[in-house]
Amino acid sequence: VIHVYLDDFRACPPGFVLARNLEECLLLLQEYEVDVLSLDYDLGWGFPNGLEVVRAMISLRAYPKRIFLHTSSDAGRKHMYEMLYQQKPDHVALVNGPVPPELLMELAHPAKE
């Protein structure tokens, strides 16, 4: 199980695998079991944005267990949230905001089994 952080600019939090663009994000969603996916909207000038990632996830039916939206774009967050809310399977948790600090700590320091 992995956790994916989609962002072209911000540093990747500990415990996450960084995806810088649509292609990397979709590859990880298709090849691995993803628990937490944290999405940015703006992914660089001239590159597919977070909404295009969401559209591709829906088309491919490639979902993580939990989705968070850490983007600073209010309009982008709104569009991604609305599309995901309407299309995601019931078992996928969707949060209209960033990963909470407590969960970031938990994912950065997983309990040893």
Where are these regions (language model features)?
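Catalytic phosphate/metal-binding cores of nucleic-acid and nucleotide-processing enzymes, i.e., regions
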Residues: 1-113
